[in-house]
Amino acid sequence: MKKFEQLRGIVAPLDRANIDTDAIIPKQFLKSIKRSGFGQNLFDEWRYLDYGEPGKDAASRQLNPDFILNQSRYQGAKILVTRDNFGCGSSREHAPWALQDYGFAVIIAPSFADIFYNNCFKIGLLPIVLESPVVDRLIRDALTVDGYQLEINLEAQTVMALSGETYWFEVDHFRKHCLLNGLDEIGLTLQHADRIRKFEINRRNEQPWLFL
């Protein structure tokens, strides 16, 4: 998992509440357990005018010109700003995978579904909770200012607009540590590899009958 320290990037505003995981990545694309390849089907039913199927070349499909991510000004966006209860619905891990594979590194909303929120941290995707009036302002600015950007500082736990406005956000200390150091669950386990090996040796010596 990549370390997350600071990020400055274009903001894509998605002015909808209660976006569920089926909208983020429709069920027909959940057959793979690899984390890559889901980005082309992110928000599939909104991004395209035709029905998406696994294996269908996204380059040959008809884009919905009205959908925000299809507008040229938001190409390359790293930060998604959206509304309440983002990621609700079924607890599919593919939803944060699709967002990350598309290119998003940060999701900002007034609230998230709990399981989705937890799944984001597991892959290094940073979900940030800001108050609704602040999100209102960010969405408004992203809709009206071409190339609108934000700067995210995880160490300081701040979101800063280029105008200088700064907003502080909360993040669990342990999750912050993992993101700053690029540690997923496997990485955390490997940090204690020596202690694990020592435990196994002692256990084998003290309870040899378990290994007969």
From Swiss-Prot:
Reactions it catalyzes: (2R,3S)-3-isopropylmalate = (2S)-2-isopropylmalate
CDD domains membership: IPMI_Swivel
UniProt-listed Enzyme Commission number(s): 4.2.1.33
Domain of life: Bacteria
Pathway note: Amino-acid biosynthesis; L-leucine biosynthesis; L-leucine from 3-methyl-2-oxobutanoate: step 2/4
SS bond list: none
Gene Ontology molecular function: 3-isopropylmalate dehydratase activity
Cellular component, GO, one term: 3-isopropylmalate dehydratase complex
Function field: Catalyzes the isomerization between 2-isopropylmalate and 3-isopropylmalate, via the formation of 2-isopropylmaleate.
Protein name as it appears in the record: 3-isopropylmalate dehydratase small subunit
Organism whose genome encodes this protein: Nitrosomonas eutropha (strain DSM 101675 / C91 / Nm57)
